[in-house]
């Protein structure tokens, strides 16, 4: 009644403007902001999924290439025949090394920027021969040498010294079931992990764990407390870590060629900065 009978024309116009224009504009603005925020969040998730897939693909391709290389070297027929047929005959083994192995090894070392070192450990010699062949005696109690008595696949490990190794059993030629040596190749971990190291999207962070749950690589975000919170969550949820909450987005993936898990995350504050920038 007051609005109809007593309010002045000016007040009626002001109130009408507020009701008919200002309030709808506020509601529309809030809705538009919310929609823009959600669209940016959706776009960020899609981009993160694509980035994670691409990083894993690139790294898997590197591991596949280097795995094929170790397999090729471990299958050298003439060298295997010499190694099993001339056990403890240093002269014969050295001749075979010079002819069939060392030139190939040096070729791979000089042409493959990821490869640092190769050695073959064998029980068929009592002393080291040439640049690559070593007696197995000093390594008989190591985990990797024991494991590769029965495990014939190429195994990738980051060991306590922080170095990346590919280890593969060298088998006899007659039955391909008896170990006559172990090929051990060391690779530059930082070069292998380059697809992850060069990823830079909204100041993203990355944690990589091997099959034993050991952290082998970390790319930290700017907020140290947020970093610790995310790493704690990963530690508590190693198998199903992907999450979207009010503080961060975390994506998880497993690599195909090695038993590694990739955790890729972004602080949501960096997304908000995109809205206000």
Residue ranges, per PLM feature:
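Extreme N-terminal signal-anchor transmembrane helix of membrane signaling/transducer proteins, especially
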Residues: 1-38, 42, 46
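Extracytoplasmic/periplasmic sensory segments of membrane signal-transduction proteins
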Residues: 46-150
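Extracytoplasmic/periplasmic sensor domains and loops in membrane signaling proteins
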Residues: 92-105, 129-161, 202-203, 214, ...
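Solvent-exposed, extracytoplasmic
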Residues: 98-112, 178-223
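Generic short beta-strand
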Residues: 118, 168, 205-208
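Conserved beta-strands of PAS-like sensory domains
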Residues: 138-141, 160-199, 263-267
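Extracellular/periplasmic juxtamembrane segments that couple receptor/chemosensory ectodomains to their
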Residues: 220-276
């Amino acid at each position: 009644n007051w609005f109809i009978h007593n309010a002045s024309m000016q007040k009626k116009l002001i109130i009408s403007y507020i009701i008919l224009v200002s309030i709808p504009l506020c509601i529309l603005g809030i809705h538009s902001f919310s929609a823009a925020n959600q669209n940016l969040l959706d776009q960020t998730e899609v981009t993160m999924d694509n980035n994670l897939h691409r990083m894993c693909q690139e790294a898997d391709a590197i591991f596949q290439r280097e795995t094929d290389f170790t397999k090729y070297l471990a299958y050298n027929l003439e060298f295997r025949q010499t190694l099993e047929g001339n056990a403890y005959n240093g002269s014969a083994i050295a001749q075979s090394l010079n002819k069939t192995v060392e030139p190939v090894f040096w070729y791979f070392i000089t042409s493959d920027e990821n490869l640092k070192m190769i050695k073959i450990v064998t029980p068929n010699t009592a002393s080291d021969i040439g640049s690559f062949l070593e007696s197995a005696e000093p390594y008989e109690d190591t985990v990797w040498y024991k494991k590769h008595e029965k495990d014939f696949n190429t195994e990738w490990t980051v060991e306590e010294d922080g170095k990346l190794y590919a280890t593969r059993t060298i088998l006899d030629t007659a039955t391909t079931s008896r170990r006559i040596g172990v090929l051990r190749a060391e690779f530059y971990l930082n070069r292998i992990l380059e697809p992850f190291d060069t990823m830079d999207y909204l100041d993203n962070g990355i944690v990589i764990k091997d099959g034993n749950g050991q952290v082998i690589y970390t790319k930290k975000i700017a907020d140290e407390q947020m970093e610790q919170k995310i790493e704690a969550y990963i530690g508590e949820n190693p198998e199903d870590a992907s999450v979207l909450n009010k503080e961060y987005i975390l994506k998880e993936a497993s690599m195909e060629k090695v038993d590694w898990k990739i955790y890729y995350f972004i602080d949501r504050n960096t997304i908000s900065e995109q809205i206000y920038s």
